[in-house]
A protein has these predicted regions:
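Active-site phosphate/pyrophosphate- and oxyanion-stabilizing loops and adjacent acidic/basic residues
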Residues: 54, 143, 166
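Catalytic cores of alpha/beta
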Residues: 72-82, 115-123, 140, 160-176
Length: 216
């Protein structure tokens, strides 16, 4: 199993599956593997999302898949029970964080204030979700928060697309930008064009690498 933190540092991208028909979820996940980034967050925003995650975990064992938009402890327990490798929260939920830690499951809580970051720091968390990134002040806010929390790394999300995600990664405190643009561009997922999903992803990863080379 890959180390999520390591691959995020390399690619800077965190694919998020917001919605998929049951027969498209696993092929979409497989497309990420083919595109070279075997990580996927499945958002728990509809009734079939948990089943989609379960199907992905069973049918695409080479991907590291987890559950996002987890709001309750019961949801977290169910996701971990079916094999979720990580849990992503929109905000900070102490009971969920502690449950994940007790069950050796990576947890990425949402933190946009110093108070929330204090809680994350106390629990030994190294990566937090910063959502919604633009509405909460973007890079400027993250840089200010990084003063006292220099070791913390931020995964930014919120209406990101294939264009606006890239400038965010110029901030070294941002470990990755999360979004579903690789599924949405050219209506790839809607059209079940899984090869296009792979191409979209490879193109985004290449742009990140090119940007980083120019910075050196």
């Amino acid at each position: 199993m890959i180390n999520i933190k390591d691959i995020l540092k390399i690619t800077g991208i965190f694919p998020i599956l917001a919605y998929a028909e049951p027969d498209s979820a696993a092929p979409a996940a497989k497309a990420l593997v083919e595109g070279g980034l075997p990580v996927l967050e499945v958002l728990m925003r509809d009734e079939q999302a948990m089943n989609n995650l379960k199907r992905i975990l069973l049918e695409v064992p080479e991907i590291t898949a987890g559950a996002g938009t987890i709001l309750t402890l019961d949801q977290a327990k169910e996701a971990i029970d079916i094999g979720a490798k990580f849990i992503v929260l929109p905000g900070y939920h102490e009971k969920i964080v502690e449950y994940c830690i007790d069950h050796d499951t990576l947890v990425v809580p949402g933190c946009v204030t110093a108070a929330e970051l204090m809680q994350a720091y106390e629990h030994g968390i190294e990566i937090v979700k910063f959502f919604p990134v633009f509405q909460m002040g973007g890079i400027e806010t993250i840089q200010m928060l990084s003063g006292p929390f220099g070791s913390m790394r931020f995964m930014v999300t919120g209406n990101l697309n294939g264009e606006n995600f890239l400038p965010l990664l110029r901030c070294d405190k941002i470990i990755a930008a999360g979004g579903d643009w690789m599924f949405q561009e050219q209506d790839a997922l809607k059209n079940r064009d899984f090869d296009q999903i792979s191409r979209n992803l490879r193109n985004s990863v290449m742009r990140v690498q090119n940007m980083r080379c120019l910075k050196k």
